[in-house]
Amino acid sequence: MICPPGENKSMAERKQGGQGNGVGSSVVTEVKPKTQKPSLYRVLILNDDYTPMEFVVYVLERFFNKSREDATRIMLHVHQNGVGVCGVYTYEVAETKVAQVIDSARRHQHPLQCTMEKD
């Protein structure tokens, strides 16, 4: 089979209905690796009897970008229920936020506890 310029044999064979000896008629499909979304983790603040409520609101605004209203709502939930969710993040981000909260609490001499758990 003579191929027109710019076409290879398999292109010419396909134009003729794929009639050929089978050489050069394989189909290449691109295989994309399946990626999974990363696991998410809830960052939790735990209630205690010593950390001022205003400091908890500050932490929620500063490290979790909460509005004053949302921070106050979460702080009251923590106060009434003993624990509250600050946000849901990938592992590394959650780990960093927990460390930031604990570090800030220690610098301000508050016993505030923060932890994370798989969502």
UniProtKB/Swiss-Prot annotation:
Any Pfam family the entry gives: ClpS
GO BP terms: protein catabolic process; proteolysis
Stretches for region Disordered: 1-29
Function: Involved in the modulation of the specificity of the ClpAP-mediated ATP-dependent protein degradation.
Name under which the protein is recorded: ATP-dependent Clp protease adapter protein ClpS
SUPFAM superfamilies found in the cross-reference section: ClpS-like
Family: Belongs to the ClpS family.
InterPro entries: ClpS, ClpS_core, Ribosomal_bL12_C/ClpS-like
Assembly behavior: Binds to the N-terminal domain of the chaperone ClpA.
Disulphide bridges: none
